[in-house]
Amino acid sequence: ANRVLLVVDGVRMNNAIYRSGHLQNAVTVDPRTIERVEVVYGSSSVGYGSDALGGVVHYFTKTPRINSKDKIKNSFSSNFNSANQSFVNHFDTELSFKNWASYSSVSVSKFGELKMGKNRKHGYQSWGLVPFYSENNTEAYQELPSENNNPNVQKNSGYEQIDFLQKFIVKLPNEKLFTLNIQLSNSSDITRFDKLNEYKDGALRFAEWNYGPQKRFLISPQFKFFPKKKFFYKGYLTMAYQNVNESRINRKFNELGRSTQSENVHVWSFNGDFETKKTVKTSFAYGFEWVKNEVVSKAFSQELILNGNEIIGKS
């Protein structure tokens, strides 16, 4: 299912539980920290491995500059979107000294419910409307669907997310650089809007259908060295550990059984990339990669214990 390979700062993000669609994984890379993105198609993508035949999307996050004129540089931005009542607040700071530098970033995002346009030029006036929705959540139980006061609003489509990045770079003797890269992304429950609007026998089928909090943690030390020899002009050694958590929770209307499936993936990787001295006509690169995935998968069902409309426990 890994049709496209996602890479961040030289570390592959694809792991044992990746599926065909990578959008839910791409959003764990904070766009406000991206310095550039490289998209590789065709035969060039083979250099990333056999699972990159569908192409590669390589994210490069911002790197602090050593010995910059601006020793301390702070930045803050706040965005508001009226269409879905979303807020995104971002703060970052960069420290630059003679032999080392630091870049710190944190983003807090809150996305509200999406709102459709009311003008349907295609003539199907009821297309996409949401007349009913589920008000069920982890703490509240509702036996029946609720009526939507504004059917153009896609109920249960909002979520929250926080992203953190810390990067240190240290200048070592003999033209070497050491970089420590730490990334953390954590979301709230993310509902499956399509599943919560699935009908069976004229009624909504699911009272709950959520992706549990999606968490991605990355720590990656990297060494860069520049021997400047003919067959070993420069090289990179990148080690990384990633911890990824994903889960799915669902329950049907008129049922108390809630099904949960959770996955926790530990990924260790080590790769080396080397280049020879480039000439006008030729360039040559070579390297190696080692990756280990350890998956812990659990699936279980629990019966809800109710006190009126309040969920007070599970059995």
Q: Which residues make up each language-model segment?
A:
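Outer-membrane beta-barrel channels and translocator barrels
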Residues: 97-100, 173-175, 226-230, 277-281
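Transmembrane beta-barrel wall of Gram-negative outer-membrane proteins
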Residues: 84-111, 121-189, 215
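N-terminal periplasmic accessory domains that precede
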Residues: 1-7, 23-27, 39, 52-75, ...
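Outer-membrane beta-barrel transmembrane domain signature of Gram-negative proteins
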Residues: 212-216, 259-315
